[in-house]
Swiss-Prot record:
This is HIT domain-containing protein DDB_G0272839. Residues 184-201 have a biased composition (Low complexity). GO terms for biological process: single strand break repair. GO terms for cellular component: nucleus.
Amino acid sequence: MNFKRLITTSFTNQIKNMKFKKTISFKPFDINNRIIYDKEPTIVFKDQKSCLLKDTISTTLEDGSKELKIKIGRFTPGLDSNNNYISSDIFEININNYSNKIDLCLNGKNPTFLRRKGKIPTKVKNWEQLLGEQLEIRKSVTLEDGDIISFLGLNGTTSSIQFTIEEDNENEKEKEKEMELDNDNTNTESIPPITSKSTSTSTSLIDTNKIQLKKHFEDPNSKNVGLSALVYFCNKPESFLDVVLYYDDKTVAVLDKYPKAKHHYLVIPRVEINTLDELTPSFIPMLEHMYNVADAIINEIISKDNDDDNLKKSDFKLGFHAIPSMKRLHLHIISNDYNTKYLKNNKHWNSFTTEFYIPFDKILNELKSNGKVKVSIKKKIKKNKKKLIH
Protein backbone atom coordinates (compact mmCIF):
# COMPACT_ATOMS: atom_id res chain seq x y z
CA MET A 1 0.00 0.00 0.00
CA ASN A 2 1.39 3.38 -0.98
CA PHE A 3 2.35 5.64 1.91
CA LYS A 4 0.53 8.95 1.59
CA ARG A 5 0.92 12.11 3.58
CA LEU A 6 -2.52 12.95 4.93
CA ILE A 7 -2.38 16.33 6.65
CA THR A 8 -5.33 18.73 6.80
CA THR A 9 -5.56 22.12 8.41
CA SER A 10 -7.95 20.88 11.07
CA PHE A 11 -5.47 18.27 12.28
CA THR A 12 -2.62 20.74 12.26
CA ASN A 13 -4.65 23.24 14.27
CA GLN A 14 -5.46 20.57 16.83
CA ILE A 15 -1.86 19.70 17.49
CA LYS A 16 0.17 22.81 16.66
CA ASN A 17 0.38 23.73 20.36
CA MET A 18 1.38 20.26 21.49
CA LYS A 19 4.55 20.23 23.59
CA PHE A 20 5.06 16.55 22.90
CA LYS A 21 8.68 16.08 21.79
CA LYS A 22 8.73 12.60 20.29
CA THR A 23 8.19 11.07 16.88
CA ILE A 24 6.08 7.90 16.65
CA SER A 25 6.17 5.62 13.61
CA PHE A 26 5.69 1.97 12.71
CA LYS A 27 6.71 -0.57 10.07
CA PRO A 28 5.29 -3.97 9.11
CA PHE A 29 7.03 -6.77 11.04
CA ASP A 30 7.37 -10.50 10.28
CA ILE A 31 7.12 -11.82 13.83
CA ASN A 32 7.60 -15.45 12.79
CA ASN A 33 11.00 -14.75 11.25
CA ARG A 34 11.90 -11.75 13.45
CA ILE A 35 12.31 -9.51 10.41
CA ILE A 36 11.24 -5.88 10.07
CA TYR A 37 10.35 -5.05 6.48
CA ASP A 38 12.50 -2.54 4.65
CA LYS A 39 9.70 -0.10 3.90
CA GLU A 40 9.02 3.56 4.48
CA PRO A 41 7.68 3.95 8.03
CA THR A 42 4.16 5.17 8.66
CA ILE A 43 4.48 8.33 10.72
CA VAL A 44 1.88 8.54 13.47
CA PHE A 45 3.11 11.79 15.01
CA LYS A 46 6.06 14.00 14.12
CA ASP A 47 7.70 17.32 14.90
CA GLN A 48 5.15 18.46 17.47
CA LYS A 49 2.91 19.77 14.69
CA SER A 50 2.36 17.09 12.04
CA CYS A 51 -0.06 14.20 12.35
CA LEU A 52 -0.23 11.95 9.30
CA LEU A 53 -3.46 10.15 10.17
CA LYS A 54 -6.78 11.84 9.48
CA ASP A 55 -8.97 10.35 12.23
CA THR A 56 -7.32 12.47 14.90
CA ILE A 57 -9.17 14.30 17.67
CA SER A 58 -7.94 16.52 20.49
CA THR A 59 -9.53 16.59 23.95
CA THR A 60 -8.89 18.59 27.11
CA LEU A 61 -8.65 16.51 30.30
CA GLU A 62 -9.86 17.49 33.76
CA ASP A 63 -6.36 18.50 34.85
CA GLY A 64 -6.14 20.95 31.93
CA SER A 65 -3.74 18.87 29.87
CA LYS A 66 -4.47 18.10 26.24
CA GLU A 67 -4.64 14.61 24.83
CA LEU A 68 -4.38 13.64 21.18
CA LYS A 69 -6.30 10.54 20.10
CA ILE A 70 -5.01 9.00 16.87
CA LYS A 71 -7.11 6.16 15.45
CA ILE A 72 -5.40 3.33 13.58
CA GLY A 73 -7.03 0.57 11.50
CA ARG A 74 -6.65 -1.53 8.41
CA PHE A 75 -6.99 1.48 6.09
CA THR A 76 -4.11 3.27 7.80
CA PRO A 77 -1.10 3.61 5.44
CA GLY A 78 1.31 0.79 6.24
CA LEU A 79 -1.39 -1.74 7.16
CA ASP A 80 -3.07 -4.28 4.88
CA SER A 81 -6.41 -2.82 3.79
CA ASN A 82 -7.50 -6.25 2.51
CA ASN A 83 -7.04 -7.96 5.88
CA ASN A 84 -10.55 -8.32 7.29
CA TYR A 85 -9.10 -9.51 10.60
CA ILE A 86 -7.94 -5.97 11.28
CA SER A 87 -10.93 -3.71 11.91
CA SER A 88 -11.09 -0.21 10.47
CA ASP A 89 -10.70 1.20 14.00
CA ILE A 90 -8.64 -1.49 15.73
CA PHE A 91 -6.94 0.75 18.30
CA GLU A 92 -6.02 4.32 19.09
CA ILE A 93 -2.84 5.94 20.35
CA ASN A 94 -3.32 8.60 23.02
CA ILE A 95 -0.61 11.23 23.49
CA ASN A 96 -0.65 13.43 26.60
CA ASN A 97 0.63 16.94 25.96
CA TYR A 98 2.29 17.47 29.34
CA SER A 99 3.35 14.07 30.61
CA ASN A 100 4.83 12.92 27.26
CA LYS A 101 3.01 9.66 27.95
CA ILE A 102 1.91 7.43 25.07
CA ASP A 103 -0.96 5.00 25.67
CA LEU A 104 -2.46 2.41 23.36
CA CYS A 105 -6.14 1.50 23.75
CA LEU A 106 -7.78 -1.41 21.91
CA ASN A 107 -11.13 -0.59 20.28
CA GLY A 108 -11.81 -3.56 17.99
CA LYS A 109 -12.85 -7.05 19.02
CA ASN A 110 -10.23 -8.71 16.84
CA PRO A 111 -7.62 -10.62 18.91
CA THR A 112 -4.71 -8.20 19.30
CA PHE A 113 -1.43 -8.83 21.11
CA LEU A 114 1.49 -6.84 22.50
CA ARG A 115 5.09 -8.06 22.53
CA ARG A 116 7.23 -5.70 24.60
CA LYS A 117 10.22 -4.01 22.93
CA GLY A 118 10.64 -6.72 20.32
CA LYS A 119 11.77 -9.28 22.89
CA ILE A 120 10.63 -12.48 21.20
CA PRO A 121 11.53 -15.82 22.87
CA THR A 122 13.90 -18.01 20.87
CA LYS A 123 11.78 -21.11 21.40
CA VAL A 124 7.99 -20.91 21.44
CA LYS A 125 5.44 -23.70 21.58
CA ASN A 126 2.40 -21.83 20.31
CA TRP A 127 1.30 -18.53 18.84
CA GLU A 128 0.32 -17.18 22.27
CA GLN A 129 3.93 -17.37 23.46
CA LEU A 130 5.05 -15.81 20.20
CA LEU A 131 2.66 -12.87 20.12
CA GLY A 132 2.83 -11.92 23.80
CA GLU A 133 0.07 -10.52 25.99
CA GLN A 134 -3.44 -10.27 24.59
CA LEU A 135 -4.86 -6.77 24.92
CA GLU A 136 -8.20 -6.12 26.57
CA ILE A 137 -10.80 -3.92 24.92
CA ARG A 138 -10.96 -0.35 26.30
CA LYS A 139 -8.01 -0.94 28.61
CA SER A 140 -5.00 1.33 28.00
CA VAL A 141 -1.41 0.14 28.06
CA THR A 142 1.76 2.24 27.77
CA LEU A 143 3.35 2.11 24.33
CA GLU A 144 7.16 1.92 24.30
CA ASP A 145 9.89 2.03 21.68
CA GLY A 146 10.25 -1.33 19.91
CA ASP A 147 6.84 -2.69 20.94
CA ILE A 148 5.25 -5.13 18.47
CA ILE A 149 1.48 -5.19 17.94
CA SER A 150 0.13 -8.37 16.31
CA PHE A 151 -3.30 -9.18 14.90
CA LEU A 152 -4.47 -12.81 14.84
CA GLY A 153 -6.18 -14.04 11.69
CA LEU A 154 -7.63 -17.26 10.36
CA ASN A 155 -5.81 -20.54 11.13
CA GLY A 156 -3.24 -18.82 13.31
CA THR A 157 -2.03 -16.40 10.62
CA THR A 158 -0.67 -13.12 11.97
CA SER A 159 -0.04 -9.57 10.87
CA SER A 160 2.34 -7.45 12.95
CA ILE A 161 3.76 -3.94 13.15
CA GLN A 162 6.68 -2.64 15.22
CA PHE A 163 6.67 0.86 16.70
CA THR A 164 9.60 3.25 16.87
CA ILE A 165 9.48 6.15 19.32
CA GLU A 166 12.27 8.71 18.97
CA GLU A 167 13.14 11.79 20.98
CA ASP A 168 13.31 15.03 18.99
CA ASN A 169 16.88 16.27 18.70
CA GLU A 170 16.71 19.61 20.50
CA ASN A 171 20.46 20.17 20.01
CA GLU A 172 20.04 20.36 16.24
CA LYS A 173 17.24 22.88 16.61
CA GLU A 174 19.38 25.03 18.88
CA LYS A 175 22.23 24.93 16.37
CA GLU A 176 19.88 26.05 13.61
CA LYS A 177 18.63 28.94 15.73
CA GLU A 178 22.22 30.03 16.36
CA MET A 179 22.72 30.30 12.60
CA GLU A 180 19.95 32.90 12.20
CA LEU A 181 21.01 35.98 10.28
CA ASP A 182 22.05 39.07 12.20
CA ASN A 183 19.45 41.16 10.39
CA ASP A 184 20.08 44.28 12.46
CA ASN A 185 23.56 44.57 10.97
CA THR A 186 22.61 43.72 7.39
CA ASN A 187 22.71 46.57 4.88
CA THR A 188 19.76 45.79 2.62
CA GLU A 189 20.15 49.07 0.71
CA SER A 190 23.17 47.64 -1.12
CA ILE A 191 20.95 44.99 -2.71
CA PRO A 192 18.94 46.37 -5.65
CA PRO A 193 15.24 45.49 -6.09
CA ILE A 194 14.73 42.05 -7.60
CA THR A 195 12.08 41.56 -10.28
CA SER A 196 11.45 38.98 -12.97
CA LYS A 197 12.91 41.38 -15.55
CA SER A 198 16.12 42.25 -13.74
CA THR A 199 18.85 40.41 -11.88
CA SER A 200 20.79 41.40 -8.82
CA THR A 201 24.30 42.63 -9.46
CA SER A 202 25.25 41.49 -5.97
CA THR A 203 25.68 37.93 -7.19
CA SER A 204 29.35 38.89 -7.29
CA LEU A 205 29.23 38.39 -3.52
CA ILE A 206 28.80 34.66 -4.17
CA ASP A 207 32.06 32.74 -4.50
CA THR A 208 31.33 30.91 -7.76
CA ASN A 209 34.44 28.79 -7.29
CA LYS A 210 32.52 26.98 -4.58
CA ILE A 211 29.70 26.00 -6.95
CA GLN A 212 30.09 22.38 -8.05
CA LEU A 213 27.62 21.49 -10.79
CA LYS A 214 26.51 17.85 -10.70
CA LYS A 215 24.32 15.45 -12.59
CA HIS A 216 21.10 14.39 -10.95
CA PHE A 217 20.81 11.14 -9.01
CA GLU A 218 21.24 8.01 -11.10
CA ASP A 219 19.07 6.06 -8.66
CA PRO A 220 17.12 8.31 -6.30
CA ASN A 221 15.85 5.32 -4.35
CA SER A 222 19.40 4.60 -3.23
CA LYS A 223 19.53 7.87 -1.31
CA ASN A 224 18.40 7.64 2.28
CA VAL A 225 16.42 10.86 2.43
CA GLY A 226 13.00 11.67 3.84
CA LEU A 227 10.82 14.60 4.79
CA SER A 228 13.63 16.05 6.94
CA ALA A 229 16.40 15.52 4.38
CA LEU A 230 16.79 19.25 3.69
CA VAL A 231 17.39 19.86 7.39
CA TYR A 232 20.18 17.26 7.39
CA PHE A 233 21.78 18.92 4.34
CA CYS A 234 21.72 22.28 6.13
CA ASN A 235 23.10 20.96 9.40
CA LYS A 236 26.11 19.27 7.81
CA PRO A 237 26.42 20.00 4.07
CA GLU A 238 30.00 18.76 3.93
CA SER A 239 28.67 15.25 4.59
CA PHE A 240 26.48 15.30 1.47
CA LEU A 241 28.85 16.49 -1.23
CA ASP A 242 27.30 14.12 -3.78
CA VAL A 243 24.10 16.16 -3.46
CA VAL A 244 25.28 19.65 -2.45
CA LEU A 245 26.16 22.15 -5.20
CA TYR A 246 27.05 25.07 -2.95
CA TYR A 247 26.90 26.10 0.68
CA ASP A 248 27.83 29.02 2.90
CA ASP A 249 26.86 30.14 6.40
CA LYS A 250 23.37 31.20 5.25
CA THR A 251 22.26 28.77 2.54
CA VAL A 252 22.75 25.33 1.03
CA ALA A 253 21.99 24.49 -2.61
CA VAL A 254 21.29 20.87 -3.55
CA LEU A 255 20.06 18.66 -6.37
CA ASP A 256 16.35 17.90 -6.34
CA LYS A 257 15.93 14.17 -5.65
CA TYR A 258 13.20 13.77 -8.28
CA PRO A 259 13.96 16.53 -10.83
CA LYS A 260 10.94 17.73 -12.80
CA ALA A 261 13.16 19.20 -15.53
CA LYS A 262 16.66 18.77 -16.91
CA HIS A 263 17.86 21.40 -14.43
CA HIS A 264 16.13 21.33 -11.05
CA TYR A 265 17.85 22.49 -7.86
CA LEU A 266 16.86 23.74 -4.42
CA VAL A 267 18.26 26.63 -2.38
CA ILE A 268 17.60 26.14 1.33
CA PRO A 269 18.03 28.65 4.17
CA ARG A 270 20.06 27.35 7.11
CA VAL A 271 17.84 29.24 9.53
CA GLU A 272 14.80 27.25 10.71
CA ILE A 273 11.70 28.23 8.71
CA ASN A 274 9.24 25.79 7.15
CA THR A 275 6.43 27.71 5.43
CA LEU A 276 5.80 30.97 3.59
CA ASP A 277 3.40 31.99 6.36
CA GLU A 278 6.34 32.22 8.77
CA LEU A 279 8.13 34.89 6.70
CA THR A 280 8.51 38.32 8.30
CA PRO A 281 10.41 41.42 7.10
CA SER A 282 13.44 40.21 9.08
CA PHE A 283 13.79 37.40 6.52
CA ILE A 284 14.14 39.75 3.54
CA PRO A 285 17.99 39.72 3.57
CA MET A 286 17.87 35.91 3.72
CA LEU A 287 15.54 35.74 0.70
CA GLU A 288 17.73 38.13 -1.28
CA HIS A 289 20.78 36.03 -0.49
CA MET A 290 18.91 32.90 -1.63
CA TYR A 291 18.15 34.71 -4.89
CA ASN A 292 21.81 35.63 -5.36
CA VAL A 293 22.86 32.01 -4.84
CA ALA A 294 20.24 30.82 -7.33
CA ASP A 295 21.30 33.44 -9.87
CA ALA A 296 24.96 32.45 -9.52
CA ILE A 297 24.09 28.79 -10.08
CA ILE A 298 22.11 29.65 -13.21
CA ASN A 299 25.06 31.68 -14.53
CA GLU A 300 27.37 28.71 -13.94
CA ILE A 301 24.99 26.36 -15.76
CA ILE A 302 24.73 28.69 -18.75
CA SER A 303 28.50 29.16 -18.97
CA LYS A 304 29.54 25.53 -18.43
CA ASP A 305 26.77 23.26 -19.72
CA ASN A 306 27.97 22.21 -23.17
CA ASP A 307 24.70 20.40 -23.89
CA ASP A 308 22.74 23.67 -23.77
CA ASP A 309 24.58 26.21 -25.91
CA ASN A 310 21.44 28.30 -26.33
CA LEU A 311 20.32 28.22 -22.70
CA LYS A 312 19.25 31.63 -21.37
CA LYS A 313 18.23 33.01 -17.99
CA SER A 314 14.68 33.30 -19.23
CA ASP A 315 14.65 29.50 -19.51
CA PHE A 316 14.68 29.20 -15.71
CA LYS A 317 11.95 29.79 -13.13
CA LEU A 318 12.61 30.65 -9.50
CA GLY A 319 9.79 30.07 -7.06
CA PHE A 320 8.25 28.41 -4.02
CA HIS A 321 5.49 25.86 -3.65
CA ALA A 322 2.49 27.29 -1.82
CA ILE A 323 2.69 24.32 0.53
CA PRO A 324 6.25 22.91 0.77
CA SER A 325 6.47 19.15 0.29
CA MET A 326 9.33 18.83 2.78
CA LYS A 327 10.40 20.22 6.11
CA ARG A 328 12.32 23.51 5.62
CA LEU A 329 11.24 26.17 3.17
CA HIS A 330 13.17 25.94 -0.12
CA LEU A 331 13.50 27.91 -3.34
CA HIS A 332 13.19 25.93 -6.59
CA ILE A 333 15.48 26.59 -9.54
CA ILE A 334 13.90 24.80 -12.50
CA SER A 335 14.39 24.96 -16.26
CA ASN A 336 11.23 25.25 -18.33
CA ASP A 337 11.87 22.18 -20.52
CA TYR A 338 10.20 19.80 -18.01
CA ASN A 339 12.11 17.04 -19.74
CA THR A 340 12.44 14.28 -17.14
CA LYS A 341 11.19 10.79 -16.40
CA TYR A 342 10.01 11.97 -12.97
CA LEU A 343 7.27 14.20 -14.37
CA LYS A 344 4.76 11.35 -14.16
CA ASN A 345 1.31 12.80 -13.54
CA ASN A 346 -0.91 15.87 -13.43
CA LYS A 347 0.08 16.70 -9.86
CA HIS A 348 3.74 16.95 -10.85
CA TRP A 349 2.89 19.15 -13.83
CA ASN A 350 0.49 21.36 -11.87
CA SER A 351 2.98 21.88 -9.07
CA PHE A 352 5.17 23.96 -11.42
CA THR A 353 2.75 25.33 -14.02
CA THR A 354 -0.17 26.64 -11.93
CA GLU A 355 -0.58 29.21 -9.17
CA PHE A 356 0.57 26.54 -6.72
CA TYR A 357 4.08 27.53 -7.87
CA ILE A 358 4.62 31.11 -6.66
CA PRO A 359 7.36 33.18 -8.36
CA PHE A 360 10.16 34.40 -6.14
CA ASP A 361 9.67 38.09 -6.90
CA LYS A 362 5.97 37.90 -5.98
CA ILE A 363 6.86 36.55 -2.53
CA LEU A 364 9.61 39.11 -1.96
CA ASN A 365 7.54 42.08 -3.15
CA GLU A 366 4.54 41.06 -1.03
CA LEU A 367 6.75 40.67 2.04
CA LYS A 368 8.26 44.12 1.47
CA SER A 369 4.85 45.74 0.87
CA ASN A 370 2.69 43.99 3.48
CA GLY A 371 5.17 42.69 6.02
CA LYS A 372 3.86 39.14 5.51
CA VAL A 373 2.96 36.63 2.81
CA LYS A 374 -0.62 35.47 2.36
CA VAL A 375 -0.89 32.22 0.41
CA SER A 376 -4.45 32.51 -0.94
CA ILE A 377 -4.33 29.27 -2.92
CA LYS A 378 -4.48 27.28 0.33
CA LYS A 379 -8.24 27.85 0.46
CA LYS A 380 -8.64 26.38 -3.01
CA ILE A 381 -6.58 23.35 -2.04
CA LYS A 382 -8.83 22.68 0.96
CA LYS A 383 -11.89 22.62 -1.28
CA ASN A 384 -10.22 20.49 -3.94
CA LYS A 385 -9.86 16.82 -3.13
CA LYS A 386 -7.23 16.42 -5.85
CA LYS A 387 -4.53 18.38 -4.07
CA LEU A 388 -1.57 19.73 -5.96
CA ILE A 389 0.94 18.58 -3.36
CA HIS A 390 3.32 16.04 -4.88
